[in-house]
Amino acid sequence: MAKRTKKVGITGKYGVRYGSSLRRQVKKLEIQQHARYDCSFCGKKTVKRGAAGIWTCSCCKKTVAGGAYTVSTAAAATVRSTIRRLREMVEA
């Protein structure tokens, strides 16, 4: 089957509606949310989005809470590093 879109990709379903800049933003989000991610438990690239913020590994069947469009957010990474730093300060 021939490739039908070059620029618009997944947002071709919206046609000419909503404006190009909004469709460009939505394209970025929809590519992220439909992508497969690496599982932090089994290491395979099998994590998919089940609902907003719910990510499930189809291999090991683990369910993880994450961001709405990606498994890990920048805020979550900051919190993890802060918790790790505070834990090291308490132990030392």
Curated annotation (Swiss-Prot):
What's the short name of a Pfam family annotated to this entry?
Ribosomal_L37ae
Cellular compartments annotated: Cytoplasm
An example Gene Ontology CC term for this record: cytosolic large ribosomal subunit
Which branch of life, at top level?
A: Eukaryota
Q: Which UniProt keywords apply?
A: Cytoplasm, Metal-binding, Phosphoprotein, Ribonucleoprotein, Ribosomal protein, Zinc, Zinc-finger
Q: Name one GO molecular function term.
A: structural constituent of ribosome
Q: Which residues carry this modification: Phosphoserine?
A: 40
Q: Which InterPro entries match?
A: Ribosomal_eL37/eL43, Ribosomal_eL43, Ribosomal_protein_eL43, Ribosomal_zn-bd
Cell membrane found in the keyword field: no
Which GO biological process entries does UniProt record here? cytoplasmic translation
Q: What else is known?
A: Present with 44600 molecules/cell in log phase SD medium. There are 2 genes for eL43 in yeast.
Q: How does the record describe its quaternary structure?
A: Component of the large ribosomal subunit (LSU). Mature yeast ribosomes consist of a small (40S) and a large (60S) subunit. The 40S small subunit contains 1 molecule of ribosomal RNA (18S rRNA) and 33 different proteins (encoded by 57 genes). The large 60S subunit contains 3 rRNA molecules (25S, 5.8S and 5S rRNA) and 46 different proteins (encoded by 81 genes).
Instruction: Return the protein name.
Output: Large ribosomal subunit protein eL43A
Source species of the chain: Saccharomyces cerevisiae (strain ATCC 204508 / S288c)
